[in-house]
């Protein structure tokens, strides 16, 4: 409960600058950030960071966000339970083999946390108080963007989140917060909260900036005389009028290691999107197109 309240507070303040803009999207998953700074407080810093960043990625509209490992584990457990026959069957029963894979993985570590506390306000939890009206806070984060197909780090960056200015206390008291009491309404005004928000904003900006350098591709799923069906839709940011190159894609493989070095398309033509659904789109017909051919944004 505590980390979800924190995530909601931070994401609401930062996602507006990254509103969806019709970009072609990729699936992405955030893994838990290791708390190498050994900072302790009323919330788990590594868990909270993953929750905050996952929520910000969703709110940005620029990614297809896959649930964190614990959420996917819960989904797989439900699928396993359904296979035992102990739950009612039907169209809504969870089925195996349908989890969306993550193309990109976000991993990192919290390397340093520094907090100078002032008097008044803050959070209280089991005898621990965070923040206050005065003082400052700083959080150092190292973030990695990993290609899930190869395990290679595509990009990395170190960010430093700083509280910057004095905090205010809005005040919220009561037991409904699961032990987290005090000025929860002022989390974003708390020095540690402001530092975390600043670091999250920088991390999100870094991830969005990497999109132009990551190849986007799809496949032809169905060929008819008057149209093609491609396995990408509104979920991936496809819009009516977009143009895609279609052709046979060959992978260039390192004969020594088996690593895929690159891919090359033998283009047969370009199609235009005429209709879009959530996971698929329809395009103009193309002579010579075959099911399974590759699809890239038109150059």
Language-model features, listed with the residues they occupy:
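Short hydrophobic alpha-helix segments
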Residues: 69, 157-159, 264, 271
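Surface-exposed short loop/turn segments
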Residues: 79-154, 164, 173-178, 239, ...
């Amino acid at each position: 409960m505590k980390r979800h309240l924190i995530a909601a507070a931070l994401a609401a303040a930062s996602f507006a600058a990254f509103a969806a803009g019709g970009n072609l999207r990729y699936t992405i998953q955030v893994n838990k950030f290791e708390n190498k700074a050994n900072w302790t407080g009323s919330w788990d810093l590594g868990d909270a960071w993953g929750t905050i960043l996952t929520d910000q990625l969703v709110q940005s509209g620029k990614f297809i966000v896959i649930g964190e490992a614990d959420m996917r584990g819960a989904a797989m457990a439900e699928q396993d339970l359904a296979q035992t026959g102990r739950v009612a069957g039907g169209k809504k029963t969870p089925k195996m083999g349908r989890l969306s894979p993550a193309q990109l993985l976000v991993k990192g570590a919290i390397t340093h946390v520094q907090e100078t506390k002032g008097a008044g306000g803050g959070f209280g939890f089991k005898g621990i108080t965070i923040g206050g009206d005065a003082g400052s806070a700083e959080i150092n984060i190292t973030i990695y963007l990993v290609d899930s197909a190869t395990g290679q780090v595509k990009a990395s960056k170190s960010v430093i989140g700083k509280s910057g200015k004095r905090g205010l206390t809005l005040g919220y008291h009561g037991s409904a917060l699961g032990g987290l009491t005090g000025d929860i309404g002022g989390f974003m005004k708390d020095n540690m909260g402001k530092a975390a928000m600043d670091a999250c904003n920088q991390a999100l900006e870094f991830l969005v900036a990497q999109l132009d350098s990551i190849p986007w591709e799809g496949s032809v799923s169905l060929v008819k005389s008057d149209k093609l069906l491609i396995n990408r839709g509104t979920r991936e940011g496809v819009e009516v009028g977009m143009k895609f190159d279609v052709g046979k894609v060959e992978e260039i493989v390192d004969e020594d290691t088996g690593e895929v070095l690159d891919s090359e398309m033998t283009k047969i033509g370009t199609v235009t999107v005429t209709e879009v659904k959530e996971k698929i789109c329809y395009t103009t017909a193309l002579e010579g197109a075959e099911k399974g051919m590759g699809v890239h944004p038109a150059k």
